[in-house]
């Protein structure tokens, strides 16, 4: 699901809200989450999951074109850990794996 699809679904379910207001709310929510993670804080949404930063240490990579070693600096990457309720809901009734 894309951001625009999410906005459409919410606007369809909450018809008393203007489409523009739903779009603003979704964009504001995502911007605030991005700012919070960028400042190093953790985000916890009970029943859904938590977002945090994980540190990737510096390492030696390889240039795929030349094969030469390249020093890659350490960095932080966003990480999502689903909550129990979300895991249970996703797995409820799933007996076969999702086919790609």
Curated annotation (Swiss-Prot):
Keyword Metal-binding: no
GO cellular component: chromosome; cytosol
Molecular functions (GO terms): DNA binding; structural constituent of chromatin
Entry keyword annotation includes DNA-binding: yes
Biased composition (Basic and acidic residues): 82-91
Keyword terms: DNA recombination, DNA-binding, Transcription, Transcription regulation, Translation regulation
Coiled coil, from the record: none
Region (Disordered): 53-100
One Pfam family of this chain: Bac_DNA_binding
SUPFAM superfamilies the record matches: IHF-like DNA-binding proteins
Biological process according to GO: DNA recombination; regulation of DNA-templated transcription; regulation of translation
Alphabetical list of SMART domains matching this protein: BHL (SM00411)
Quaternary structure annotation from Swiss-Prot or TrEMBL: Heterodimer of an alpha and a beta chain.
Function: This protein is one of the two subunits of integration host factor, a specific DNA-binding protein that functions in genetic recombination as well as in transcriptional and translational control.
Family stated for the protein in its record: Belongs to the bacterial histone-like protein family.
Protein name (Swiss-Prot/TrEMBL): Integration host factor subunit beta
Phylogenetic placement of the source organism: Bacteria, Pseudomonadati, Pseudomonadota, Gammaproteobacteria, Chromatiales
Gene that encodes the chain: ihfB
């Amino acid at each position: 699901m894309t951001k625009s699809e999410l906005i459409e679904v919410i606007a369809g379910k909450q018809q008393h809200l203007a489409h523009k207001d739903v779009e603003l709310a979704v964009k504001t929510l995502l911007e605030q989450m991005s700012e919070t993670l960028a400042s190093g804080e953790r985000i916890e949404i009970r029943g859904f999951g938590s977002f945090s930063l994980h540190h990737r240490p510096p390492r030696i990579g390889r240039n795929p074109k030349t094969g030469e070693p390249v020093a890659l600096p350490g960095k932080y990457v966003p990480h999502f850990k689903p909550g129990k309720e979300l895991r249970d809901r996703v797995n409820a009734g799933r007996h076969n794996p999702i086919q790609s």
